[in-house]
A protein has these predicted regions:
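ATP/Mg2+ or Mg2+-diphosphate-binding catalytic cores
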Residues: 2-3, 10, 183, 303-344
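Active-site acidic catalytic loop and adjacent metal/ATP-binding pocket
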Residues: 41-60, 93-95, 204-254
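ATP-binding pocket architecture of kinase catalytic cores
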Residues: 52-159
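Activation segment
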Residues: 65, 128, 237, 245-247, ...
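Active-site activation/catalytic loop segments of kinase-like enzymes and analogous catalytic loops
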Residues: 250-281, 297-313
Length: 344
C-alpha cells in the first residue's frame, strides 16, 4: 500500500487524496473497504462515504492539515463520547486500529488516526432529513435535545478548543483581513474596516453588559447548530459532526435555528424554549447576545473565506467572494447590525 504524504504547508493540503489514497488510509486504520467511495459536501475538511465489506458504509473525515492539533480534535471526540454516554443522539467516532507501519492511532477512545500526514476520524453512517422548523412540536423536541446537549456540555470544559467571544471570532477576523494584502479591494477597504470596527464595538458592549455581575456561563457547545447540521428521523434529531465545538453561551446553539426577523422568530423561540426549559434552566438575559453573535459570525465567515481562498474548492464554490460588490454588501449588513444592536 502506498502512502503519499499530505502537503501540510501547501495551499493544496488535500491534493494527494486520490480515491486509492482514501481507501488505503481507511484500510490502514483497520477497516476493509469494498471499493465504494463517494465524496460528500465539505469545504473545511474532506469527507467521504466509504463502503465496507459486508455492505455497511462509514464516514471518513480527513481534517484539514494544519487546522487542528491532536488535542483539539481529541476534545471534540471526547465531547461526542460524553454525549453518547448520556444518551444524547450524536454519532461518535469509531475506535481505530493501526494496520500499517506508517499509521498510528491516538486518544482515549483510539479514535484519531494518522496516516500519510493526514488526521482522520471514521464514524458510522447515519441518515436523516432536515427538521421541519415551522412545526412547533419539532421546535419543542429540538429544545429538549439542546437542553440535554448543554447539560452534558456543562459537565466538562475544553482546554484546547476555541472560546467564543468578540476577540476570538470578531477581532481575529478583522486583524486577518486588515493584514491581508489582497483580501479587501482598495476602493472599499476603509469603508469595510470602519463598519466592521463599529459593529464589533457594539458586540463587545453587549457582551460586557452580561458581566461582571451577570457573567455569561460558558459550556461546551455544538457551535454551528444551523438546520443544515441537524438530521431528523422518526426517533427525533441528531447531529453527526462536532467540528466547530467550542466553549460559549448556550444561546449560540439556538439562534441559527430561527430564521427571519425578531417578530417572526418570537413564536419559534417560544416553542424552542418551552422544550428547553422542560429539562434545563435557560438564562433569558443571554438572548440579548443573538445579534452580537450574528455579527461575529458574519466577520468570522468573511475571514474564513479569505484564509481558504488558495484552496481551489473555495473560488469554485464562492465565486462572488472578494468582489467589490461582496464587500459593499457586507458594509451594508454590518451597518444594519450596528443599528440593531444599538436599539437593543
Amino acid at each position: 500500500m502506498s502512502t503519499p504524504h499530505a502537503p501540510t504547508g501547501s495551499p493544496l493540503p488535500f491534493a494527494d487524496l486520490t480515491p486509492d489514497a482514501v481507501l488505503n488510509a481507511v484500510e490502514a486504520l483497520g477497516l476493509v473497504a469494498d471499493g465504494r467511495l463517494m465524496a460528500l459536501n465539505s469545504y473545511e475538511n474532506r469527507v467521504f462515504m466509504v463502503g465496507l465489506d459486508g455492505g455497511d458504509s462509514v464516514i471518513a473525515k480527513f481534517y484539514r492539515p494544519g487546522r487542528w492539533t491532536d488535542e483539539q480534535i481529541l476534545e471534540e471526540h471526547q465531547f461526542a463520547h460524553d454525549l453518547q454516554a448520556d444518551e444524547v443522539p450524536v454519532v461518535a467516532p469509531l475506535a481505530l486500529s493501526a494496520q500499517h507501519p506508517e499509521a498510528r492511532v491516538v486518544g482515549a477512545h483510539q479514535s484519531l488516526g494518522h496516516v500519510a500526514g493526514h488526521r482522520i476520524a471514521i464514524s458510522p453512517r447515519r441518515g436523516g432529513r432536515a427538521p421541519e422548523l415551522d412545526d412547533p412540536e419539532v421546535l419543542r423536541w429540538l429544545g429538549r435535545f439542546l437542553a440535554r446537549l448543554h447539560q452534558t456540555g456543562a459537565q466538562g470544559r475544553f482546554e484546547h478548543r476555541l472560546t467564543l467571544n468578540p476577540d476570538t471570532l470578531g477581532q481575529s477576523a478583522i486583524d486577518h483581513l486588515q493584514n491581508s494584502d489582497d483580501a479587501l479591494p482598495l476602493g472599499v477597504r476603509q469603508r469595510w474596516l470602519d463598519a466592521a470596527t463599529e459593529a464589533l464595538a457594539q458586540a463587545r458592549e453587549a457582551f460586557d453588559r452580561q458581566g461582571p455581575v451577570r457573567q455569561v456561563r460558558q459550556v461546551r457547545l455544538h457551535g454551528d447548530m444551523h438546520p443544515g447540521n441537524l438530521l431528523w428521523t422518526p426517533e427525533g434529531p441528531h447531529f453527526v459532526d462536532l467540528d466547530d465545538a467550542c466553549m460559549g453561551p448556550a444561546v449560540q446553539d439556538l439562534w441559527m435555528l430561527l430564521p427571519g426577523d425578531r417578530d417572526e422568530r418570537r413564536p419559534m423561540m417560544d416553542a424552542l424554549m418551552d422544550g428547553y426549559e422542560s429539562l434545563a434552566e435557560f438564562d433569558w438575559h443571554t438572548l440579548a447576545l443573538i445579534e452580537p453573535l450574528r455579527t461575529l459570525r458574519m466577520l468570522h465567515h468573511s475571514a474564513w473565506l479569505a484564509r481558504r481562498w488558495a484552496d481551489p474548492a473555495f473560488p469554485a464554490a464562492f465565486p462572488w467572494f472578494g468582489t467589490e460588490a461582496y464587500w459593499l454588501q457586507q458594509v451594508e449588513l454590518l451597518n444594519q447590525q450596528t443599528l440593531v444592536m444599538r436599539e437593543g
